[in-house]
A protein has these predicted regions:
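Boundary at the C-terminal end of the N-terminal hydrophobic targeting segment
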Residues: 36-39
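A cross-kingdom marker for long, charged
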Residues: 242-270
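Bacterial N-terminal signal peptides
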Residues: 25-33
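Cell-envelope/glycan interface and biosynthesis
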Residues: 41-250
């Protein structure tokens, strides 16, 4: 912006014309204000994506995320979507449509922050096919087991940090057996990719877990349901500290589920 201001100041000399100083200053003020407004118009969600995924998102311009590989991705398609459409056909903006309430242990109706995953965005980062994801996976030690996890965006290192901290709490050990991490598949009953497909999600303690359909058989996605959870809050807080969201904070709860989604936590700070 400073270069443009200097250009405005020297423009009369370059063109060989006389321009009243007050008029020139007015032009500079207007230009500066317009530039400032343009900078402030970056959606908060886009700013967060740039902050937490710097290896893939380098900027935002004219409604598009600017990716580090030189491509761009529409941030908001402008469509008004139903709850299910945000899950099945979400854009990057839709990922921030729901509240991840870290101050309550009982989710509000239809607040499923993290269940909306823009598939082109996640496939850009983690891999567009099963083979592409698998070739990046690394082994992470998890309480006597080895689980496959992606190192992309620091996810595997974050899981290791979770394990290190949980190891200080032997009383929690019975909840920590892995029930699965990487698994390329669709979400049950839907046509959208499961978060497990990207290798940045782990299920734990299935024997002590609760799932909304287990407790509410036959209920639809927009029905009122009853909540249940047996996973200790201490486990949840440790995962969240290292960038993971918990499926137990969803209205459509899945309490075994921990998913590396630092953008959701950044958008919903404590």
């Amino acid at each position: 912006m400073n270069n443009m201001v200097n250009t405005l100041k020297t423009l009369p000399t370059i063109l060989g014309i006389k321009m009243p100083r007050h008029f020139l200053m007015l032009c500079i003020v207007i230009f500066s204000a317009c530039t400032s407004v343009a900078q402030q118009n970056i959606p908060k969600g886009a700013e967060i994506l740039m902050q937490v995924y710097p290896d893939f998102v380098k900027g935002y311009n004219d409604g598009y995320l600017l990716m580090t590989d030189g491509t761009k991705m529409l941030y908001d398609d402008g469509r008004k979507k139903t709850f299910l459409q945000k899950l099945d056909d979400g854009d990057p903006e839709d990922m921030f449509a729901f509240k991840y309430d870290r101050h309550s242990w009982t989710p509000e109706y239809l607040q499923d922050a993290g269940r909306s995953r823009c598939e082109p965005f996640f496939k850009k980062m983690y891999g567009a096919t099963e083979a592409q994801v698998k070739q990046k996976l690394v082994s992470v030690s998890w309480f006597g087991e080895k689980v496959l996890f992606t190192p992309v965006n620091g996810a595997a290192d974050s899981l290791r940090a979770v394990a290190t901290e949980l190891a200080k709490h032997p009383e929690l050990r019975t909840y920590l057996k892995s029930s699965g991490s990487f698994y390329w598949r669709k979400v049950r009953g839907a046509n959208r990719q499961s978060a497990h497909s990207y290798g940045m999600t782990i299920d734990i303690g299935v024997a002590k877990s609760d799932y909304w359909l287990w407790k509410n058989p036959g209920r639809g996605e927009t029905a009122r349901i009853t909540y249940a959870n047996r996973i200790p809050h201490e486990i949840v807080l440790i995962f969240e500290k290292h960038g993971f969201i918990w499926g137990g904070r969803w209205y459509h709860y899945d309490t075994m589920h921990f998913e590396f989604r630092p953008e959701i936590l950044a958008a919903n700070p404590l």
